[in-house]
Regions:
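Active-site neighborhood of glycoside hydrolase catalytic domains
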Residues: 1-39, 44-59
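Generic recognition of stable, solvent-exposed alpha-helical segments in well-folded globular domains
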Residues: 1-8, 50, 94, 117, ...
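Acidic/polar loop patches that form or flank catalytic/metal-binding clefts of enzymes
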Residues: 14-24, 62-66, 132-138, 160-161
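A glycine-rich phosphate-binding loop feature that marks nucleotide/adenosyl-phosphate handling sites
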Residues: 25-31, 69-72, 141-145, 165-169
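Active-site beta-loop-alpha junctions enriched in small/polar residues
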Residues: 25-27, 43-45, 67-69, 102-106, ...
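Histidine/acidic-residue-rich catalytic or RNA/ligand-binding cores of hydrolases
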Residues: 32-35, 72-81, 111-115
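Aromatic-lined glycan-binding groove of carbohydrate-active enzymes
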Residues: 48-103
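C-terminal functional modules
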Residues: 101-116, 120-207
Length: 207
């Protein structure tokens, strides 16, 4: 059903001059493949994974937003600056259209927090997304950060310092606990709000 539905939608979009982009190819297989003209924005998989390889061999085009390396809403305790910079997916079959960093903001409460999560990881992604492995140097990147930070200071961006972006074991543990608590509390509040909506609707229907 998933494959049939997505192919119908993609066909409709293409007839109207657009191009369908999906976040998952899990419902696609050799017997019932998704239309190869659908672009896969790889979010929940690694670009080095088997599913990506299979779909690429079928001629699919990709956008690389693979988790966790390009998920900027994840704490530095899970994916630090060094890991972000050194992520180097193998060349894929098919066509790689580009790279897009992702940040889900439901757990981010302020612009200050947003700045902290995005910078300087976005600079690492910008430098490495189209660079060959041989052209990359993490040490050179670190040496260029002071000048980058000077630019961010002009625009009052509240970035993570190098110590914060590559946290020690103790700081990593603290970040992890804070992030998990924030995530759990958000979902609790969301569930409470949904429960209240359901009760309100039930009252209206019973009137």
């Amino acid at each position: 059903l998933y494959t049939w539905f997505m192919n119908k939608i993609a066909s409709h979009i293409e007839k109207n001059g657009g191009k369908a982009i999906i976040r998952s190819c899990d419902g696609s297989d050799k017997e019932k493949p998704l239309d190869k003209n659908i672009i896969w924005q790889v979010c929940d998989k690694d670009m080095n994974g088997k599913v990506v390889s299979r779909e690429g061999k079928m001629g699919r085009a990709f956008i690389n937003s693979s988790s966790p390396h390009y998920y900027l809403n994840l704490p530095y305790s899970m994916i630090n600056l060094k890991k972000t910079y050194e992520y180097a997916p193998e060349p894929v079959y098919g066509e790689l259209l580009g790279t897009e960093a992702v940040i889900w903001t439901e757990h981010i409460s302020s612009i200050k927090s947003l700045d902290f999560m995005v910078f300087p990881r976005i600079a690492a992604i910008a430098e490495t997304a189209w660079s060959d492995k041989d052209d990359r140097s993490y040490e050179r990147f670190l040496n260029s950060l002071p000048e980058y930070y000077d630019l961010l200071n002009i625009y009052e961006v509240r970035y993570a310092t190098l110590k914060q972006a590559n946290p020690s074991k103790l700081r990593k543990a603290a970040y992890g606990v804070a992030w998990r608590n924030k995530t759990v509390n958000f979902h609790r509040l969301y569930d409470l709000a949904e429960d209240e909506k359901s009760r309100s609707l039930a009252k209206k229907e019973n009137r």
